[in-house]
């Protein structure tokens, strides 16, 4: 059973703390022993059971052995590097491709200074940041999909 400690609102010291915004964590269900002995082990065991269950149901097998005499036509990087690979593959000048890669972190560093007047946490009330985020997300997905296609179809995604 959990132990609940009810506040005594007639206490003047407690009322002074509550007026200052303090005391909200003093009451309710205690972390020891309820959370640390009962809830956390259940979550940890549930996570382990989920990982083991997924490993048993769908094991990840190793691929074919590497053959040094049969090189594939195009070697693709890991999935999270597809947009970068696509930029470097499509841009004719490699120095320009590297310069485009440096613009991404520079744009992310400049973004807070562009819209520092608006202090709202709601992203829909911050149109510049929201539009740049959506544009970047769509562009990243477009480049990632294009990297999986042959180079002649990569810019149009094979649609035209």
UniProtKB/Swiss-Prot annotation:
Which keywords accompany this UniProt record?
Electron transport, Membrane, Photosynthesis, Thylakoid, Transmembrane, Transmembrane helix, Transport
Instruction: Please provide, in alphabetical order, the Gene Ontology terms of the cellular component aspect for this entry.
Output: plasma membrane-derived thylakoid membrane
List where the protein spans the membrane: 36-56, 95-115, 131-151
**Membrane keyword on record:** yes
Pfam families on file: Cytochrom_B_C
Matching entries from CDD domains are given as: cytochrome_b_C
Query: Where's it found, cell-wise?
Result: Cellular thylakoid membrane
What protein family is recorded? Belongs to the cytochrome b family. PetD subfamily.
Query: Assembly state and interactors?
Result: The 4 large subunits of the cytochrome b6-f complex are cytochrome b6, subunit IV (17 kDa polypeptide, PetD), cytochrome f and the Rieske protein, while the 4 small subunits are PetG, PetL, PetM and PetN. The complex functions as a dimer.
What is the role of this chain?
Component of the cytochrome b6-f complex, which mediates electron transfer between photosystem II (PSII) and photosystem I (PSI), cyclic electron flow around PSI, and state transitions.
Protein name according to UniProt: Cytochrome b6-f complex subunit 4
Q: Organism source for this protein?
A: Prochlorococcus marinus (strain NATL2A)
The organism's lineage? Answer: Bacteria, Bacillati, Cyanobacteriota, Cyanophyceae, Synechococcales
């Amino acid at each position: 059973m959990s132990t609940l400690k009810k506040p005594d609102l007639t206490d003047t010291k407690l009322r002074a703390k509550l007026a200052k915004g303090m005391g909200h964590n003093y009451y309710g269900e205690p972390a020891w022993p309820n959370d640390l002995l009962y809830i956390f082990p259940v979550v940890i065991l549930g996570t382990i059971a989920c990982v083991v269950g997924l490993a048993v149901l769908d094991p990840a097998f190793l691929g074919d052995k590497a053959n040094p005499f049969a090189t594939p036509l195009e070697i693709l990087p890991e999935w999270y590097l597809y947009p970068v690979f696509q930029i470097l593959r499509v841009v004719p000048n490699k120095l320009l491709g590297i310069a485009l890669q440096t613009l991404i972190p520079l744009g992310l560093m400049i973004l807070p200074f562009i819209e520092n007047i608006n202090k709202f946490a709601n992203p829909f009330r911050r149109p510049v940041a929201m539009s740049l985020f959506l544009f970047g997300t769509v562009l990243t997905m477009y480049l990632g999909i294009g990297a999986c296609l042959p180079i002649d179809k990569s810019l149009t995604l094979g649609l035209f």
